[in-house]
C-alpha cells in the first residue's frame, strides 16, 4: 500500500502507484503545481533484504536525473553573471582546450557536444572518486568527434566538466551552491554530495536483470558505458559523499518534483523567483537536436536538460525533463503548470521512458 498524501481528485495516481508496487522494490512519486503538493506518495522497501520500509524521509540515488538539477545551478550562475553560456569552457578552464576543444562553449558542453563521453583507454576506476583529478584527465582527452558538431551523451564525464566550470566560476562547488542557495532556503530534500550522516536513510539499489539495448556498440557508446572502468563505484559510501553533478544526486520524489518545478513555472519555486526570465530562457533554449551518438534516440538537447520530443514527460511538447539510470525521472510542464518526480531502487534496463514512470505520468495528466 502507498503512504503519503494525495490531493482530492488525484486518487487515480495513488491507484496507479499501488498497482505498480508489485513491480517495485521501493519507490516514491510526487507532483506539484504552483507550489501546491498534488501528490507525495511512497511505498515498498528501502533495502534489498526487505527489512526497512520506504519512508517519507527515504532518499534514493537518482543518477542522471541529477543533470536537470545541475543545469538549474548553472543557469543560476549565469543569472548572477558568473558565467555565460556562450563562453568557451577553456576561457574558465584553459587545460580543457587541449586537442581542439578550445572553442567548445559552455552551452555546447551542457548539450553533450564535447566529444568526451568517457575514457576509451583504461583508467583506475578510483579516478571517478577524485573529482579534481578526474576533471583534469577529462580535459586532457582527445575528442571522439569534432566538438560542437554532434551530441553524444556523456553519462558521467558531463558532471565533472560542469562541476569544474562551476567551481572556477563561483569558487564554490556545484553541490554547495545547490545546498546553500536553492535547497536550504526552500526546504528541498535533494543533495549532490550526501554526507555520511545521511546515508542511513538512503535506499539500496537492486541492479537490473538485463542490459539496456543500445544497438551497435560504437566507440563512443563503448567509452560511455561498456568498459570495465565506466562505472564510478556506485552505491559505495565514498561515492555518495563526493559530488558528481551528472550522476549521484540523492533525493525524495518530492525533492525532485520541487526542483523540476523551475521548468514548469519559468524559473520559480513555490511562487518565489529563482531565475530571471532571461536566464530561464537560456536554460531551456534549444541547443542541439539529432540522433545522439551514444543514446539510441533522437534527442532535443537544451542547456543540460531534454525537450519532450520523445513523449517521456507527458503529452505536452513544452515539457522539459531528464531521466536517470534505472528509471528515475523529473520534469516540468509549463503548459500544464505541473512538475513531477519519480524515484525508485529497483533498476530496470530502460534508458529513458521507463514504463513505471510513464504509467504514473499518464495517471497524473488524467487528473489535471
Predicted ranges, named:
Residues 56, 61-65, 69, 77-121, ...:
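Active-site helix/loop module of the DD-peptidase/beta-lactamase fold
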Residues 3-62, 82-84:
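Short, conserved catalytic-motif segment at the N-terminal edge
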Residues 41, 124-146, 172-189, 230-232:
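Short, charged, amphipathic alpha-helices and their helix-cap/turn boundaries
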Residues 112, 158-165, 247-269, 328-345:
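Active-site-proximal alpha-helical segments within enzyme catalytic domains
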Residues 55-57, 141-148, 158-161, 236-245:
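Flexible glycine/proline-enriched surface loops and loop-helix/loop-strand junctions
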Amino acid at each position: 500500500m502507498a503512504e503519503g498524501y494525495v490531493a482530492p481528485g488525484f486518487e487515480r495516481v495513488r491507484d496507479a502507484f499501488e498497482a505498480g508496487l508489485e513491480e517495485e522494490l521501493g519507490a516514491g512519486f510526487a507532483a506539484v503545481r504552483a507550489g501546491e503538493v498534488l501528490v507525495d506518495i511512497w511505498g515498498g522497501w528501502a533495502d534489498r533484504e526487505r527489512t526497512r520500509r520506504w519512508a517519507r524521509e527515504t532518499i534514493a540515488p537518482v543518477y542522471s536525473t541529477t543533470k536537470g538539477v545541475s543545469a538549474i545551478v548553472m543557469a543560476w550562475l549565469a543569472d548572477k553573471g558568473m558565467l555565460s553560456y556562450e563562453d568557451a569552457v577553456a576561457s574558465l578552464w584553459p587545460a580543457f582546450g587541449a586537442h581542439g576543444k578550445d572553442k567548445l562553449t559552455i552551452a555546447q558542453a551542457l548539450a553533450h557536444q564535447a566529444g568526451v563521453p568517457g575514457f576509451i583507454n583504461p583508467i583506475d576506476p578510483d579516478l571517478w572518486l577524485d573529482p579534481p583529478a578526474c576533471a583534469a584527465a577529462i580535459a586532457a582527452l582527445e575528442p571522439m568527434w569534432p566538438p560542437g558538431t554532434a551530441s553524444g551523451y556523456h553519462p558521467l564525464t558531463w558532471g565533472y566538466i560542469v562541476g569544474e566550470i562551476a567551481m572556477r566560476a563561483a569558487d564554490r562547488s556545484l553541490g554547495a551552491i545547490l545546498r546553500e542557495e536553492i535547497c536550504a532556503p526552500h526546504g528541498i530534500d535533494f543533495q549532490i554530495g550526501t554526507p555520511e550522516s545521511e546515508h542511513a536513510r538512503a535506499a539500496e539499489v537492486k541492479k537490473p536483470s538485463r542490459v539496456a539495448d543500445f544497438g551497435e556498440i560504437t566507440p563512443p557508446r563503448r567509452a560511455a558505458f561498456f568498459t570495465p572502468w565506466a562505472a564510478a563505484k556506485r552505491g559505495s559510501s565514498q561515492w555518495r559523499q563526493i559530488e558528481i553533478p551528472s550522476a549521484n544526486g540523492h533525493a525524495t520524489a518530492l525533492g525532485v518534483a520541487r526542483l523540476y518545478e523551475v521548468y514548469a513555472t519559468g524559473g520559480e519555486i513555490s511562487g518565489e523567483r529563482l531565475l530571471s526570465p532571461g536566464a530561464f530562457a537560456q536554460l531551456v533554449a534549444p541547443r542541439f537536436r539529432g540522433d545522439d551518438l551514444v543514446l539510441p534516440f533522437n534527442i532535443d538537447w537544451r542547456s543540460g536538460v531534454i525537450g519532450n520530443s520523445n513523449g517521456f514527460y507527458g503529452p505536452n511538447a513544452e515539457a522539459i525533463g531528464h531521466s536517470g539510470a534505472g528509471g528515475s525521472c523529473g520534469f516540468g510542464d509549463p503548459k500544464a503548470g505541473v512538475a513531477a518526480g519519480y524515484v525508485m531502487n529497483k533498476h530496470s534496463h530502460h534508458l529513458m521512458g521507463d514504463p513505471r514512470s510513464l504509467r504514473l505520468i499518464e495517471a497524473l495528466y488524467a487528473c489535471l
